[in-house]
Amino acid sequence: MRRVLVRYKVTADRAAENEAFICAVFRELAQAAPTDVRYCSLKLEDGVSFVHIMEAEGGGGSLTELPAFKAFTAKIRDRCEEPPTATEFSPVGAYRVFTV
């Protein structure tokens, strides 16, 4: 099982665009309905910082191969004030995590 947390900060004028890319990824995930990946995206209180959490069996290809995900990540650095940093993690505990 692979678990990754990604954090970055976009410029204020690109925050809505970034959020639109993220929404497109979730629309494609809903259509494809892969069972080997869990994925969550969060916008932090400042409105420009984002966190993504992924848990996947294998490498996460069900997510990373989606056309919307490729479009989202293709030029993400152009939107960023602070570039993405990825960190693998191990969960310590969780309870009913989120409802969207």
Give residue ranges: language-model regions.
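Residue-level signal for secondary-structure boundary sites
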Residues: 14-16, 60, 94
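A general secondary-structure junction signal
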Residues: 43, 88-91
